[in-house]
Regions:
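Acidic metal-phosphate-binding loop of nucleotide-sugar-dependent transferases
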Residues: 29, 61-62, 95-96
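Short, solvent-exposed beta-strand edge segments and adjacent coil->beta transition regions
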Residues: 4-6, 59, 155-157
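Canonical Radical SAM [4Fe-4S] cluster-binding loop centered on the CxxxCxxC motif
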Residues: 2-34
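Short acidic donor-binding/metal-coordinating loop in glycosyltransferase active sites
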Residues: 11, 59-60
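Residues that line or immediately flank small-molecule/substrate-binding pockets and catalytic motifs
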Residues: 26, 59, 118
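Radical SAM/AdoMet-radical enzyme domain recognition
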Residues: 40-56, 65-177
Length: 177
C-alpha cells in the first residue's frame, strides 16, 4: 500500500435520483475552479512518488460533472506519461447517464471499473429520477449497450450491486439479469 496513491473525488453533491434511503442532501454543489486547481496541485505533487495512482469517482452522481471527471483524469494521464506510474480509475454511479458515448469518453480517460446499484423490481420506487419517473429501463438499456462493446477494444468491469429491501420477495429479478 505504500506504493499506491488513491484519491476519492466527489465532483458534486448533486444527484439526478431521489432515493428515499439516501443520506445526501442533494445540494447542486459542484467543485469550483479553485478546488480543481488545488486538486491538480495536490495530485501533481504526490503522484510521482508512487508506482500506482487510483482515482475513485463518487458522489452525489459523478456523471453529472463529466467535464470535471475528464479534466482531472486528463491531468493524471499526462502525469502518467511523464512519470510512468500505473493509472487506474473507477466510478460509483447510478448508471442512468452512462450511455455508449459517455462510457467511451470515460474509457479514454482511464475509467474502466464501475459500481452501479439496482434495487430489483422495486427499483423505480426506491431509485426514482428527480422528475419522479422510473430509471430502471434506462439503466438496463445502457448496460445492454455496453455489454455489446467489442471486448478486444474495451476491457472494463461493472459490478452490479443489488440492495435487498425488507419487502423484496420476488427473486425472479436474478433470472431477469
Amino acid at each position: 500500500l505504500d506504493n499506491i496513491f488513491m484519491v476519492t473525488l466527489m465532483p458534486t453533491e448533486g444527484c439526478n435520483f431521489r432515493c428515499p434511503y439516501c443520506y445526501e442532501d442533494h445540494h447542486a454543489v459542484s467543485m469550483t475552479r479553485d478546488t480543481l486547481d488545488r486538486i491538480e496541485e495536490y495530485i501533481t505533487a504526490q503522484a510521482p512518488r508512487y508506482k500506482q495512482v487510483i482515482l475513485a469517482w463518487f458522489g452525489g452522481e459523478p456523471t453529472l460533472c463529466k467535464d470535471t471527471v475528464l479534466e482531472v483524469s486528463n491531468i493524471v494521464q499526462n502525469l502518467q506519461k511523464q512519470y510512468g506510474f500505473h493509472y487506474a480509475a473507477n466510478m460509483t454511479t447510478n448508471g442512468y447517464l452512462l450511455n455508449d458515448k459517455l462510457f467511451r469518453q470515460f474509457y479514454q480517460a482511464g475509467i474502466t471499473s464501475y459500481q452501479i446499484t439496482i434495487d430489483g423490481w422495486n427499483h423505480d420506487k426506491t431509485r426514482p429520477h428527480v422528475s419522479g419517473k422510473g430509471t430502471l429501463q434506462t439503466i438496463i438499456n445502457n448496460l445492454a449497450s455496453l455489454s455489446k462493446l467489442p471486448p478486444a477494444e474495451y476491457s472494463f468491469h461493472i459490478t452490479l450491486r443489488h440492495n435487498i429491501l425488507a419487502d423484496d420477495e420476488d427473486y425472479s429479478w436474478y433470472d431477469y439479469l
